[in-house]
Curated annotation (Swiss-Prot):
Keywords for this protein: Cytoplasm, Exosome
Organism name: Methanothermobacter thermautotrophicus (strain ATCC 29096 / DSM 1053 / JCM 10044 / NBRC 100330 / Delta H) (Methanobacterium thermoautotrophicum)
Similarity annotation: Belongs to the RNase PH family. Rrp42 subfamily.
Predominant localisation class: cytoplasm
Stated name of the protein: Exosome complex component Rrp42
Gene Ontology BP term (one): rRNA catabolic process
Subunit structure: Component of the archaeal exosome complex. Forms a hexameric ring-like arrangement composed of 3 Rrp41-Rrp42 heterodimers. The hexameric ring associates with a trimer of Rrp4 and/or Csl4 subunits.
Disulfide bonds: none
Coiled coil stretches, renumbered: none
Entry's localization field: Cytoplasm
Gene Ontology molecular function, alphabetical: mRNA 3'-UTR AU-rich region binding
Gene coding for it: rrp42
Amino acid sequence: MVNKMDIIPEITRKSITDLINNKERIDGRSLHEFRDISIETGVISKAEGSSRVKLGNTQIIVGVKPQIGEPFPDTPEMGVILTNSELLPMASPTFEPGPPDERSVELSRVVDRCIRESRMIDLEKLCIIEGSKVWMLFLDLHIIDYDGNLFDAAVLATVAALLDTRIPAAEVEDGEVVINREKMQPLPVNRKALMCTFAKIGNEIVLDPSLEEEDILTARISIGVTEEGSICAMQKGGEGPLTRDDVLKAVSIAVEKVPQLIEYLDKSMTP
């Protein structure tokens, strides 16, 4: 496999790196600034919850489909979350049709981990009959435009879609589950959690790398943070190392930025 770093023109790599080492970026942002963000919910009429998020030119649509099914054997009293990501070929020339590749699998796992480990959804409240009937939440992520930093956009879109989701009341009568679609209710949400991704370029770490910056990074770290400021997920990428100071700096910035993102999310979802 050809290393991407080998085919990026040296002049491009050097110009971006020199700017960042001088505390500047090619799109005019500061080192620790997100691109413009927009959030829409209720964008898929056939889904019980959905969202469209744009982070710069990166665009993701997420749909949530609840279904009654069996719990996992080791958690018979808890509902189930299943996450699937589709990297549509129209989103990037590097995305190919066919079964999920390692990037799609990694994206699904990172989003799932951030939602699950943050305990965002109270899965015990999604249990209908312990050991046999629970709500299963199918999360479908569709990347329709890729311009860098899928993780942050995907987590934001997934959280927005979950907050938008309504499920019918489910009652047990004579051992059978009866669904009442006249009583739609929100998911049992404990808290919100979002993610901040950083790229190591030159001597600096930069927040929310664009595609051009991703192409030349030496290392990447994504940090999931709850609204209370607890770390709930972390993912390292790239072939290069990160120093202890790099990681601590990234964590500090993420803990500062996530409450701001959550405030923006809450405002975006207010009717």
